[in-house]
């Protein structure tokens, strides 16, 4: 079924599930139509295949669509690389040819921590109270104002949601759609002031590899922004320092009836180890600049157990202390056992880009001006996560992060206001004008 037929069907649907669905009109903005189309293309990355780029072949499905659309919009060099990087260049407007080129970057992939295939977007006219995205097994999939107080400010808005069975994919297809809509505006009116623009859509951001293979020299930009944040107005130039710790526990299986003094249960070793890490430094107890240990997964038998943690902190010294505590916990257990049964492997992932971006305050100032020019109050926040901009900044391309307008990423309650999609495209237009 052609995408426009799917779009027409989705937007004409007026079934009620705890909220009023908006009927289609002939005035749907370009960015909305693009967004609804892009989220229906599955692009989940796969951490199990992190040794290859892209980690999932499905990311080419969107990459090829975007490359073709960019060519149709006049970016003659637009292409998708063998690793699913979509790159294109837009010439500067008249009078801005001598200005430094500016990059705009978003990522193709969606996370695998929630179902991401078969996304069925729809538009809910939100009237307050619980936001009900859909139903699963006869039960509403809802977000309450108690859990998300920001909903109180969105009454009367049209919100794009999934049907409650999958994530939506606003992270980061909202950013993709907003950049593409800006390119479409420039194609329609090349006199809109802008420097030469580099456009890039990267794969595998969700598994920490999004910027690794971007050829910065060929990209040719002095500065860049990722469009990968949350609610409208977010402006981020600090992120976590990040590492992954894989901890292995070797047990000794003995018949339980003969186990005294002989059995070493690897599953229990894991429990002992996990208890040595401060529980108040788990994600569910932290906010702002507070770092954490996050147990992402564990598998255990009596003979062997493996636990995978991610470790995060904005402060480099506190980050190192967290890594040192993991090593110390393993050493303590090994000393108690009199044998090296606990081993730790730590893999560095990314560093706090504030180390680089703080030397380019003009990038923050110009972004603030662009938000304010569009009637949006900028909110400068630390990223409680990572972004392609972290890797790029340390590779020589200073790269703060801008909002997309989305909420509740990485879950079935994810949504984005239609007005935020439009407004963020306006912000990007104002931003590039200030570099012209």
Model-derived segments and spans:
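A non-catalytic alpha/beta surface segment that caps or lines the substrate-entry region
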Residues: 50-99, 103-105, 109, 120
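N-terminal capping segment at the start of a domain
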Residues: 28-56, 161, 350, 410-411
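Zn-dependent metallopeptidase/amidohydrolase metal-coordination segment
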Residues: 301-303, 377-430, 435
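Flexible, glycine/charged-enriched surface loops at secondary-structure junctions
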Residues: 48-49, 77, 191-196, 279-294, ...
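Midchain, well-structured core segments that form catalytic/ion-binding scaffolds
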Residues: 148-151, 157-170, 204-327, 331, ...
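Active-site metal-coordination/substrate-binding segment of hydrolases
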Residues: 96-196, 201, 221
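Active-site-adjacent substrate-binding region
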Residues: 268-285, 292-294, 341, 351-399
């Amino acid at each position: 079924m052609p995408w426009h037929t799917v779009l027409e069907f989705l937007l004409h649907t007026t079934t009620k599930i705890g909220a009023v669905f908006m009927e289609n009109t002939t005035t749907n903005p370009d960015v909305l139509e693009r967004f609804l189309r892009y989220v229906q293309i599955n692009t989940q990355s796969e951490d199990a295949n992190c040794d290859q780029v892209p980690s999932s072949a499905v990311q080419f499905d969107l990459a090829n669509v975007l490359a073709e659309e960019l060519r149709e919009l006049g970016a003659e060099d637009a292409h998708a690389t063998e690793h699913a990087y979509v790159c294109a260049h837009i010439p500067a407007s008249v009078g801005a040819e001598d200005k430094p080129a500016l990059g705009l970057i978003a990522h193709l992939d969606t996370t695998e921590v929630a179902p991401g295939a078969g996304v069925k977007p729809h538009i809910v006219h939100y009237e307050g109270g619980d936001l009900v995205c859909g139903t699963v097994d006869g039960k509403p999939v809802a977000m309450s104002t108690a859990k998300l107080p920001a909903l109180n400010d969105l009454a009367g808005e049209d919100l794009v949601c999934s049907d409650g069975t999958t994530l939506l994919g606003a992270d980061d297809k909202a950013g993709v759609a907003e950049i593409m809509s800006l390119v479409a505006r420039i194609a329609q009116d090349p006199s809109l002031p802008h420097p030469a623009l580099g456009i890039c859509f990267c794969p595998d951001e969700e598994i920490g590899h999004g910027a690794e293979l971007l050829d910065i020299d060929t990209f040719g930009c002095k500065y860049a922004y990722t469009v990968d944040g949350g609610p409208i107005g977010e402006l981020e130039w600090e992120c976590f320092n990040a590492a992954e710790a894989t901890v292995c526990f070797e047990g000794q299986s003995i018949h339980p009836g003969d186990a005294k003094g002989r059995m070493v249960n690897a599953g229990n070793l894991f429990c002992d180890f996990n208890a040595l890490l401060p529980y108040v430094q788990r994600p569910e107890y932290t906010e702002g600049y507070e770092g954490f240990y996050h147990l992402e997964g564990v598998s255990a038998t009596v003979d062997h157990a493996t636990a995978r943690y991610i470790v995060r902190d904005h402060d480099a010294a506190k980050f190192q202390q967290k890594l040192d505590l993991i090593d110390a916990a393993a050493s303590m257990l090994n000393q108690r056992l009199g044998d090296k049964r606990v081993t730790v492997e730590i893999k560095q992932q990314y560093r706090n880009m504030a180390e680089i971006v703080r030397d380019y305050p003009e990038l923050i100032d110009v972004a603030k001006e662009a938000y304010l020019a569009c009637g949006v109050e900028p909110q400068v926040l630390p990223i409680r996560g990572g972004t392609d901009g972290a890797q790029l900044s340390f590779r020589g391309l200073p790269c703060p992060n801008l909002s997309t307008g989305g909420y509740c990423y990485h879950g079935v309650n994810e949504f984005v206001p239609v007005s935020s999609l439009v407004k963020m495209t306006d912000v990007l237009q104002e931003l590039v004008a200030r570099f012209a």
